[in-house]
Regions:
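Terminal hydrophobic membrane-targeting helix
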Residues: 43-145, 209, 226-241, 251, ...
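Active-site-adjacent "gating/activation" loops or surface patches in catalytic cores
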Residues: 244
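Short acidic-hydrophobic surface loop/beta-edge motif
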Residues: 66, 186, 219-222
Length: 261
């Protein structure tokens, strides 16, 4: 006996609801978002170039510059630059003779600080709020054959950079220049005379290469053999002119006279 079952397919049970359809719209950058991202990327690149690239380039290029242009050795311990305040700082800068067996020192600087101003952009001149040189030391030597080490350095520079008649001085404005606790070692090996001058302090205010801009200066130095030098006045770089007074106190004239002979 056969049994036939008839039924409605829809009566098997309730059907599962259909999944809702989601449509994803492409993300669109708003204008302020594009500006924010672009500004952030530009600031990041500028910061990286200032905080890292500038010090790296200076430390890398200074020895190469000294070797190529001056035929001397140079070193620098540390360089820091803030791209937002435009302040450059460096420590332990040294220049030495390259040909001598003991690499005789020429010039060393304990610390250097340079403060550039943003108004250089609109002023069309390099505007420096401050240049400060701390603990510089110069070693001036006349060899037994009569060669002056500083003159040799200048002669090397002039050979690599012959004078050109065209062009003038760069547009430069320095609000304050200071040299602190300087020292000069003087040694004349030909005459058998040696002396040193320390401390040397020098300040220069409002000096400029712009036309008819006058600045003031002050210099003081003490000699180990006796004597105090004071020099102050005003100066201009364009045109080159100056006036002031020079005072020498407690100088050791017998020792100096013997050397000058």
């Amino acid at each position: 006996r056969r049994k036939h079952f008839a039924g409605n397919a829809g009566s098997a049970g309730p059907s599962a609801p259909a999944a809702p359809a989601f449509q994803t719209e492409p993300f669109r950058w708003k204008r302020w978002q594009r500006w924010a991202v672009g500004t952030g990327c530009a600031l990041a690149a500028y910061s990286a170039a200032g905080f890292w690239l500038v010090p790296y380039v200076i430390k890398d290029q200074l020895p190469k510059f000294a070797e190529k242009e001056l035929a001397r050795q140079a070193s620098i311990a540390d360089v820091r630059f803030n791209p937002f305040t435009l302040r450059l700082e460096a420590d332990q800068i040294a220049f030495r003779e390259a040909s001598s067996a003991n690499n005789a020192p020429l010039l060393s600087i304990g610390a250097l600080a340079v403060q550039l101003e943003w108004k250089s952009i609109v002023r069309r001149a390099w505007s420096l709020a401050e240049i400060r040189i701390t603990a510089p030391q110069a070693h001036l030597t006349i060899t037994p054959d009569g060669k002056f080490n500083l003159a040799e350095v200048l002669a090397t520079w002039q050979r690599n950079h012959p004078e050109k008649s065209e062009g003038g001085m760069p547009r430069l404005v320095i609000a304050h220049f200071a040299l602190e606790q300087g020292k000069v070692d003087w040694q004349d090996q030909k005459a058998g005379y040696a002396d040193n001058f320390t401390p040397i302090n020098f300040t220069l205010d409002n000096i400029s290469t712009l036309p008819d801009a006058n600045g003031s200066y002050s210099l003081s130095a003490d000699a180990a053999r006796g004597g105090k030098l004071h020099w102050r006045g005003t100066a201009s770089l364009s045109p080159i002119r100056g006036e002031g007074e020079l005072i020498l106190n407690d100088a050791s004239l017998p020792g100096l006279a013997a050397y000058l002979k």
